[in-house]
């Protein structure tokens, strides 16, 4: 990312405080998720975007875990954005910036199935 683009993004997202939530049943996450999230933290830090990574490993039901994480977001009015990422997903940190810059109230992103059926 060049300096001009970084400055534009920094200005556009200066108000953002992002809570990244990942339910990690059994305290486990995939290495691809870890690499992606470390990259996201580096990118957000470089751009001066406030953020927090929140994992929950003590809940076996994903819906209940997400509800608990949503309560954390709602309970802290300093957060402006909530992002759920599953612990088995690899993603491009730049995609998170595009989602934040979309200015939509709710948005999502596609990701491939865990196994590709090459015969189809």
Question: Which functions belong to the PLM regions below?
Answer:
Residues 77-92:
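Short beta-strand-to-loop acidic/aromatic patch adjacent to the donor-nucleotide binding site
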Residues 62-75:
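Short, conserved alpha-helix that lines the donor NDP-sugar binding/gating region
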Residues 47, 72-76, 102:
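Alpha-helix C-cap/termination motif
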